[in-house]
Amino acid sequence: MSLDPIILLTLRASVTLLFASAIAHKLWNAAEFQQTLRGYLQGFSANEHGLQKPLFLMIVVLEFIVLGLCLFPSTHIAAGLLASGVLLVYAAVMAVNLLRRNVLIDCGCSWGKSRHMLHPALLVRNVMLALAALAITLPLNDRELFTLDVISLVFATVTAAVLYTAGNKILSLGFTERMKIA
């Protein structure tokens, strides 16, 4: 099975943007993200003292590797597999914290402007993102790209980014209110 180049290239560009923005978020808000990591570690009953900085560095390096793989067409299979795996690990970590009722921590995805309480909807979101990332491993339908294709690619990628941002904002609105109550 192969995908039309516009669909596949839009997915690749969107996954690239997702990981680039995730890296920027973590680097610009390093202290807040380390606080979030501390909350997640508590859900694992781990002694978080001293773990959050190495874990922070490991996550950033891993996301940089995904980003680097996403930038080159020849590494799209590795990019898709690793990106999907990272997103599923994040979902699994959220699931463990949800099961242990450690939900009053930020999910780590809000750019420091609003805090998302952990919720099963975030697991669904991450699984959907992982499936999209996995789709970039599919072979590209080898057809010539035209100017209209490139324009479509740009608009589709921007639309995907706007929809992702809007979806996160909608999720945060409901969860933020519950965090204030708790």
Regions picked out by a protein language model, each given a short descriptive name:
Residues 1-182:
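Membrane-interfacial helix-loop segments of redox and metal-homeostasis proteins
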